[in-house]
């Protein structure tokens, strides 16, 4: 019984890790929310937070601002989580 449970857990873990590495297409709001969740955590995207960023949050965007090609990378073709993380 314990051996069956252990094998089942190992198979489930490997299936979940493969699903995360799978390339997917992200566009528009879904792309921006996914990137924000990966870079700054799941609680970083809030609708009621207001339009203005705090001074520290605005400064943290300085390195990301100049990068181009995210929409091409993940909307025109599928991208992986690792590719999304490279834009953080």
From Swiss-Prot:
It comes from Agrotis ipsilon (Black cutworm moth). Its main location: secreted. One of its GO terms (cellular component) is extracellular region. The modification Arginine amide is found at residue 65. Keywords: Amidation, Cleavage on pair of basic residues, Neuropeptide, Pyrrolidone carboxylic acid, Secreted, Signal. InterPro entries: Insulin-like (IPR016179), Insulin-like_sf (IPR036438), Insulin_CS (IPR022353), Insulin_family (IPR022352). Disulfide bonds: none annotated. It holds the Pfam family Insulin. It is found in: Secreted. The keyword Secreted applies. It comes from the Eukaryota. DAGWWLTRGAARSLGGVR-amide: Expressed in corpora cardiaca (CC), corpora allata (CA), antennal lobe (AL) and gnathal ganglion (GNG) (at protein level). Expression in CC and CA detected in most animals, in AL and GNG in few animals (at protein level). This is Insulin-related peptide 4. One of its GO terms (molecular function) is hormone activity. One of its GO terms (biological process) is neuropeptide signaling pathway. Residues 20-45, 69-88 form a propeptide. PROSITE patterns: INSULIN (PS00262). Belongs to the insulin family. Residues 1-19 form the signal peptide. The keyword Aminoacyl-tRNA synthetase does not apply.
């Amino acid at each position: 019984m314990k051996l069956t449970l252990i094998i089942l857990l190992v198979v489930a873990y490997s299936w979940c890790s493969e699903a995360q590495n799978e390339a997917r297409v992200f566009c528009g709001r879904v792309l921006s929310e996914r990137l924000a969740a990966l870079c700054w955590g799941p609680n970083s995207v809030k609708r009621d937070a207001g339009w203005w960023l705090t001074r520290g949050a605005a400064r943290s965007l300085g390195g990301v601002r100049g990068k181009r090609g995210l929409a091409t990378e993940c909307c025109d073709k599928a991208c992986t989580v690792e590719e999304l993380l490279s834009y953080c």
